[in-house]
């Protein structure tokens, strides 16, 4: 415990040089081991006492996929460390060895989908939001839940309201394929007392409302919003939009 009496005795114990590239890591610590996401989708397990590298896993990207983006978050569940890669794959690694236990495709990177946020764990489910939804496809950005043991997808919630569904009319008569943005750039959070997941979404795309054939008074749900989701089925319990039509 660091307090007023001992804070002046803190000193550098060791230093670890990370991979080159953009890096915004949030390391995990478990049983004295640091699990660190690096640029280039490299995961390292480091002894917390002396900084010794215990194991390293490097994601193999398909030809043409991005390779230098940042990963912001990892998740730990039982004996597994899980990561959502930049090219849209969920991977579970053995926490002791770094060996891949399973992998599951979240989205097709060829359509522009990517990932930077990383999963959280709730009741044995890995919950993750995707980004890279600017190219206009038949499916928008989304949040998914996967079985933490097997990788099976359990539910999927789209972050753009579809025509004919609640909030769908806030995009006017735009077909679903032209409703872009509302990406999930950072990891969500979970409130166990409320039993709710919370995720933030980005702005609509294209950025300028007139380019969408809309005005700034058109809400384009569920962009620029905080979403509260039921972790059991992914249903939107409530939402709050911070800026309308931005």
Regions found by a protein language model. Name each.
Residues 2-18, 43-65, 77, 89-110, ...:
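Extracytoplasmic/lumenal domain signature
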């Amino acid at each position: 415990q660091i307090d007023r009496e001992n804070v002046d005795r803190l000193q550098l114990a060791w230093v670890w040089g990370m991979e080159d590239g953009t890096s915004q890591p949030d390391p995990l610590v478990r049983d004295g081991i640091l699990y660190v996401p690096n640029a280039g989708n490299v995961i390292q397990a480091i002894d917390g006492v002396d900084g010794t590298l215990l194991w390293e896993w490097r994601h193999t990207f398909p030809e043409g996929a991005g390779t230098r983006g940042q990963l912001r978050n990892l998740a730990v569940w039982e004996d597994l460390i899980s990561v959502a890669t930049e090219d849209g794959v969920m991977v579970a690694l053995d926490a002791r060895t770094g060996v891949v236990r399973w992998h599951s495709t979240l989205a097709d990177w060829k359509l522009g989908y990517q990932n930077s946020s990383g999963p959280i764990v709730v009741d044995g489910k890995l919950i993750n939001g995707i980004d890279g939804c600017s190219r206009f496809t038949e499916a928008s950005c989304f949040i998914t839940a996967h079985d933490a043991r097997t990788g099976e997808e359990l539910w999927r919630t789209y972050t753009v309201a579809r025509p004919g569904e609640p909030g769908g009319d806030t995009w006017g008569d735009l077909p679903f394929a032209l409703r872009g943005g509302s990406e999930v750039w950072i990891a969500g959070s979970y409130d166990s007392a409320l039993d709710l997941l919370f995720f933030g979404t980005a702005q609509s795309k294209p950025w300028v409302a007139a380019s969408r054939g809309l005005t700034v008074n058109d809400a384009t749900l569920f962009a620029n919003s905080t979403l509260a989701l039921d972790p059991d089925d992914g249903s939107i319990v409530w939402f709050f939009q911070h800026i309308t039509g931005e």
